[in-house]
């Protein structure tokens, strides 16, 4: 087995073990809620296809091409008997996107859907999105409220931290 294939085998094996790992209840608990040993989503949970170019000609060393800092602050909902979380996925550039992961029990075996959520670019000045919250409404739609961030035009020159936050809304069936 060559170096590329060996690395691909290791990456795939580790990823499959991670997403199929059974979570362990931490005992004794407090009688009100249960804690578990492993986080349900981490920066290692997004699909390898999102992070790696699997073409040996363009990525002969199988290096990660899209780095992920964290997966966190998810909105969650039970839908059609499964647990869905719409998580914030933050890249190494500190910009975020939303992606949906699904679990049969809400405790482990979360698997991301094939593609991240695609939000329409209605406001080109927006630079980041985060903090999605979901609810299923009696009208049959699932609504999501999230925070949308834009650079503060009144910030001093060179200030990369000042921002203006606004609320966004999405809906889907």
Where are the regions that the model predicts?
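Beta-rich carbohydrate-recognition and catalytic domains
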Residues: 1-73, 77-127, 135-173
């Amino acid at each position: 087995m060559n170096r590329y294939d060996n690395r691909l085998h290791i990456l795939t094996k580790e990823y499959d073990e991670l997403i199929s790992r059974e979570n362990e209840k931490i005992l004794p608990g407090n009688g009100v809620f249960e804690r578990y040993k492993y986080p349900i989503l981490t920066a290692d949970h997004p699909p390898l296809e999102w992070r790696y170019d699997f073409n040996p000609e363009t990525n002969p060393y199988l290096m990660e091409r899209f780095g992920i800092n964290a997966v966190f602050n998810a909105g969650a909902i039970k839908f059609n008997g499964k647990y869905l979380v719409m998580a914030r996925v933050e890249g190494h550039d500190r910009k975020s996107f939303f992606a949906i992961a699904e679990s049969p029990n809400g405790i482990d075996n979360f698997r991301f859907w094939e593609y991240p959520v695609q939000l329409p670019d209605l406001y080109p000045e927006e630079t980041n999105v985060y903090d999605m919250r979901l609810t299923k409404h009696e009208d049959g739609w699932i609504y999501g409220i999230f925070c949308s961030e834009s650079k503060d035009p009144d910030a001093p020159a060179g200030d990369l931290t000042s921002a203006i936050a606004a609320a966004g809304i999405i809906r889907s069936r």
